[in-house]
Amino acid sequence: MGKIINIDPEILSGTPVFSGTRVPIKNLFDYLETGETIDEFLDDFQGVQREQVIKLLEFSHKMINSSAGILHENFA
């Protein structure tokens, strides 16, 4: 599988979307935030492949973990 995120000014004014679709990446996180499942997301956005979702979540996980040294936590 190639790239999973596409940013093109001609597609939704440059909003990051799943490659090969017009489905914004944000939609996946909105679904997950409201307690919906990956399967529900995929049912509603049939152009997105499960592999794309998994790779995006793995990428996000790696980015958060690798950013631990530069993020500032304020527990005040």
Functional labels for PLM-detected ranges:
Residues M1-A76:
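Small, basic N-terminal interaction modules of short regulatory proteins
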